[in-house]
Amino acid sequence: FENLCRLMSEAETKGKYYKPRIDHDLMEQYNEGIICLSGCASSEISVRLRNGDKKGARKLVDWYAKVFKDRFYLEMQDHGHPDSPTHWDAQNKINLGLQKIAKETGLPLVVTCDGHYLCHADAEAHEILLCIGTGSNLSDPNRMSLKDFQLHVIKPEDIISRWGQDFPEAIRNTKRIAERCEVELELGRILIPKFPVPDGEDEKSYLDKLVFRGLVYRYCGTSLAETEALSVAECR
């Protein structure tokens, strides 16, 4: 869990470009204890399978398997309509590619649901959220939209109906992954990290000092050395 938090922090503070990002070096450095899945249709493995780059996909799979060992799974999804599983041909192409790689390598498959929102009824709210994030209008026919896909958290019985006959082991692997997750988070209290502060200060007094000194330095024409010698009262 600590490694996962480290990766998230690095992605947000150092790797962000529109979205938080991490690279292979970071994953290799902080992989211990983390279970890794090959990702949705936009992952680097899936994109190569979509584009017909089977060698490139296999090379990446081999790298992930080497780094994460028995904690790496090939991830199948299907967000077309339940009555038409191949509604999105690209997803079907990815799944077939993953199934082939699983046979060649012996790596385990797992079925997942790319849940962007909880219930199917939340799809419209999700479209509005996408508009806010991309600065577009609902009326724009060329805007980013995911309305053609079912991205809610699918009920277990629907997953079993879709995958159970052909890939029962891939469904069982979801339970195996859950059983391997050993972190228990304490709920009901604030879990904000403790920020290191100088002797004689608490978090509030130190924040006040930084804020007021920052205001004086930026707007009163004093030097940095002069500003750092001021108390909060003098800054006010």
Q: What does each model-found stretch correspond to?
A:
Residues F1-R236:
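Phosphodiester-processing cores and adjacent nucleic acid-binding clamps
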